[in-house]
Amino acid sequence: MNTVKTLRELRAAVAQARAEGKQIGFVPTMGNLHAGHASLVQIAAQRADFVVASIFVNPLQFGAGEDLDKYPRTLAADQERLLAAGCHLLFHPDAAEMYPHGMGDQTRVTVPGVSEGLCGASRPGHFEGVATVVTKLFNMVQPDLAVFGEKDYQQLAVIRALVQDLNMPIQIIGAPTQRAEDGLALSSRNGYLSAEQRAVAPALYRSLQSIAEALHHGARDYARLIETAQTQQREAGFTPDYLEIRNALNLRPAQLDDRHLVVLTAAHLGSTRLIDNLLVELAGQ
């Protein structure tokens, strides 16, 4: 696996792979990689001949008071994990390479609708930053396919809308959430948890499971289900941010006759904000 830092080197390497008739797969990341990221690379390697990953901690998607400066940088360990997962090329630019004219006058990409509410309400400007950097990376790499985790479900919906609306010839693949044995969704931010917090963190997923189980048993009072689950979260030590039941296909608020649902939540455990979601497929009427 080669590591390149400039757009010029990246394009030369991708052009060489294209000249050899290879399909290009792409996995964008911010580094501090775990088994969830590795699964994305493995899926890309199964679907494409040449896998490009990127590591770039994107300042545009961090709001005021968020954890940009303390976000872990673990390049050597990340390189080992990427290589083992089947990555062929790592693009590791700095901010000057990504935003050569600075970020103040940078063209921004906004995806209305799916980027609003949920994490979009809690983190103003976050999805604009995500959409902008992903658009730039897609133009830099020009992949045939790209893999994103379902763990960041709203982000995946934003990327799907972006690619569709801007007519990008890129297949977007959603990868299942990877979890620890106790159910906690793998996340780089889990490293911020104390031992005591880590022990109670799986309660976030259990609150989603309780809603899913009730839905499968015919419950349709969404407001009551949400209230009960948020009480569970508080009793476990969380401060809930949001918990909502949405249509899994378009992220609109769920209607009573919707069959494809997703339950999404964000909550703080101490100073660490965790997110999770659970897809719920209901049998037809």
UniProtKB/Swiss-Prot annotation:
It comes from the Bacteria. InterPro entries: Pantoate_ligase, Pantoate_ligase_C, Rossmann-like_a/b/a_fold. Belongs to the pantothenate synthetase family. Homodimer. The keyword Protease does not apply. The gene is panC. Keywords: ATP-binding, Cytoplasm, Ligase, Nucleotide-binding, Pantothenate biosynthesis. Its main location: cytoplasm. Its EC number is 6.3.2.1. It comes from Ectopseudomonas mendocina (strain ymp). Pfam families: Pantoate_ligase. The active site is at residue 37. GO terms for molecular function: ATP binding; pantoate-beta-alanine ligase activity. This is Pantothenate synthetase. Transmembrane segments: none annotated. GO terms for biological process: pantothenate biosynthetic process. PANTHER family: CYTIDYLATE KINASE/PANTOATE-BETA-ALANINE LIGASE, PANTOATE--BETA-ALANINE LIGASE. ATP binds at residues 30-37, 149-152, 186-189. Catalyzes the condensation of pantoate with beta-alanine in an ATP-dependent reaction via a pantoyl-adenylate intermediate. The keyword Metal-binding does not apply. It is found in: Cytoplasm. It is an enzyme of class 6 (ligase). (R)-pantoate binds at residues 61, 155.
